[in-house]
């Protein structure tokens, strides 16, 4: 079967507006059969089934669409679905459902049609199971059941027991967006996945499940106006022909300076005014501490000190140390000696009270592999004795898919809380991803977000990981700068991407860090 996805985006979570009535058609919307909330009867008083296709196990009664369990084997999936014609070129499809068991997966069927190649249907599905959403390409038959090919998946917060599950799919031209609607009211939704189809296969929309049972209590479809991305647009990766990884970005006087793993020995500095177009301004630091092993100059970051000088923390042959310069372009002069051995991925966080903290990954004597932190003296190159503590270790399953790794720390402060972001898994795994933890103190203790990771791979972008944050040119948007693999078949040379991030309110009162990415579709330039 020919795959039709040309470009793809996986994105962070968001909210839902109230479900609207089911309307189809172009132009002025006309109310059509509303399968989950209105019973339509024929002249003889019998309820009319509005669906043009009802798969095995699906029944429509009393205005409710039900998918009966098709298997008792919890390891088996027997996908089936039901759909009707969307009736509109661009639409918003909302589904409210309840799952029968922990093994149930169900959601929205879209771009569907009765298949000429199969005795059944084909299309796409956006589903929820437990605490994960999935995007599938579906083909199959009524004999074997629908055959799902996973295009992407993402962790989300598990629905509360008995809570209604709300999913949405929007079609806008050739672009589709899939939403898990669980945020607080008043927040505009961001999609979990965004992708482009050139062959829509069909115009059917409806419901789908994996054969373990679901009840669809509401389905509604309404036309929307097509809109395009306003202004100038970019597509990831923004570095294009430039090769770099582990980006640390500093904004100074309206310009962005990106320091990264790129030069064989030393560090290049890349400069931009808009975060999209970058130029290599050459080496900003040469050899440090007599260490000349090519390819082992990793993950630099730079901050501006109170006296106006610039301090770089860098990893050289698995030694962590500091270098100082008068300009963000360098030259950075290394301190007399490194600070720690068997340590990498340094990050300096400057708190509002002027205190500096160093975060890093260490496995030296007495240290378990993970992220550590300590307080710095005012010079930002000297560690305060007795302040070193472990803050993050690879204890969660998603951090152990490829090795046991938590690395690449970066700290944001929001509403008085400290958000420590980091990457999990080996950098060369497609599952290399970004998560975060929250604390009331810069040195912890930190509590990991229960729906990590918040940035993970898709069928188009592998290994989105080591990162830093900055703000857009006008300061109104939070931007994450991160690297990905060269392609889905090669890790190197890695390249740099940018996407939007934000803090979204939750019922707990602790805002959730969300990322609109990793994107592969056209996005508006940072404001």
Regions found by a protein language model. Name each.
Residues 1-9:
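Bacterial N-terminal signal peptides that target proteins for export
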Residues 18-21:
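C-terminal motif of bacterial Sec signal peptides marking the signal peptidase cleavage site
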Residues 25, 29, 33, 40-54, ...:
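Beta-rich carbohydrate-recognition and catalytic domains
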Residues 57-75:
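Short carbohydrate-recognition loop motifs
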Residues 72-139:
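Secretory/extracellular carbohydrate-interaction modules
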Residues 93-95, 159-193:
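Carbohydrate-binding surfaces in secreted/extracellular proteins
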Residues 141-166:
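Short, aromatic/His-centered strand-loop micro-motif at the edge of beta-sheets
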Residues 189-217:
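Flexible glycan-contacting loops in extracellular carbohydrate-active proteins
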């Amino acid at each position: 079967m020919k795959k039709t996805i040309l470009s793809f985006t996986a994105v962070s979570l968001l909210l839902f507006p109230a479900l609207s009535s089911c309307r189809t058609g172009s132009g002025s919307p006309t109310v059509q059969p509303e399968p989950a909330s209105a019973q339509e009867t024929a002249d003889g008083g019998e309820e009319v089934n509005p669906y043009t296709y009802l798969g095995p196990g699906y029944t429509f009664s009393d205005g409710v669409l039900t998918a009966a369990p098709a298997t008792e084997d919890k390891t088996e999936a027997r996908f089936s679905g039901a759909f009707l014609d969307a009736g509109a070129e661009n639409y918003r499809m909302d589904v409210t459902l309840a799952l029968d068991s922990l093994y149930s997966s169900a959601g929205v069927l879209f771009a569907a049609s009765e298949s000429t190649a199969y005795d059944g249907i084909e299309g796409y599905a956006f589903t929820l199971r437990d605490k994960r959403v999935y995007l599938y390409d579906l083909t199959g038959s009524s004999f074997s059941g629908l055959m799902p090919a996973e295009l992407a998946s993402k962790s989300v917060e598990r629905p509360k027991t008995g809570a209604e599950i709300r999913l949405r799919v929007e079609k806008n031209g050739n672009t589709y967006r899939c939403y898990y609607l669980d945020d607080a009211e008043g927040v505009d939704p961001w999609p979990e996945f965004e992708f482009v189809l050139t062959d829509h296969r069909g115009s059917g929309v409806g419901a789908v499940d994996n054969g373990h049972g679901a009840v669809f209590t509401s389905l509604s479809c309404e036309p929307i106006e097509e809109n395009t991305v306003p202004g100038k647009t970019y597509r990831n990766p923004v570095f294009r022909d430039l090769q770099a990884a582990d980006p640390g970005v500093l904004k100074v006087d309206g310009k962005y300076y990106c320091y990264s793993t790129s030069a064989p020995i030393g560090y290049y500095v890349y400069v931009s005014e808009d975060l999209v177009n970058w130029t290599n301004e050459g080496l900003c630091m040469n050899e440090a501490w007599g260490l000349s092993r090519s390819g082992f100059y990793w993950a630099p970051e730079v901050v501006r000190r109170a006296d106006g000088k610039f301090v770089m923390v860098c990893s050289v042959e698995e030694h962590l140390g500091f270098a100082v310069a008068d300009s963000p372009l360098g030259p950075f002069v290394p301190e007399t000696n490194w600070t720690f051995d068997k340590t990498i991925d340094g990050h300096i966080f400057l708190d509002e009270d002027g205190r500096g903290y160093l975060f890093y990954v260490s496995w030296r004597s007495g240290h378990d592999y993970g992220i550590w932190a300590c307080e710095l003296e005012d010079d930002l190159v000297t560690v305060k004795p007795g302040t070193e503590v472990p803050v993050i270790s690879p204890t969660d399953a998603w951090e152990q898919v490829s090795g046991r790794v938590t690395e690449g720390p970066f700290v944001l402060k929001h509403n008085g809380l400290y958000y420590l972001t980091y990457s999990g898994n080996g950098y060369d795994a497609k599952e290399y991803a970004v998560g975060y933890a929250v604390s009331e103190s810069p040195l912890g203790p930190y509590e990991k977000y229960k729906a990590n990771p918040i940035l993970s791979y898709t069928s188009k972008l592998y290994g989105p990981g080591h990162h830093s944050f900055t703000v857009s040119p006008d300061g109104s948007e939070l931007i994450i700068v991160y690297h990905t693999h060269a392609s889905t078949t090669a890790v190197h040379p890695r390249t740099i991407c940018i996407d939007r991030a934000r803090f979204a309110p939750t019922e707990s009162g602790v805002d959730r860090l969300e990322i609109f990415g990793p994107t592969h579709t056209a996005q508006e330039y940072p404001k």
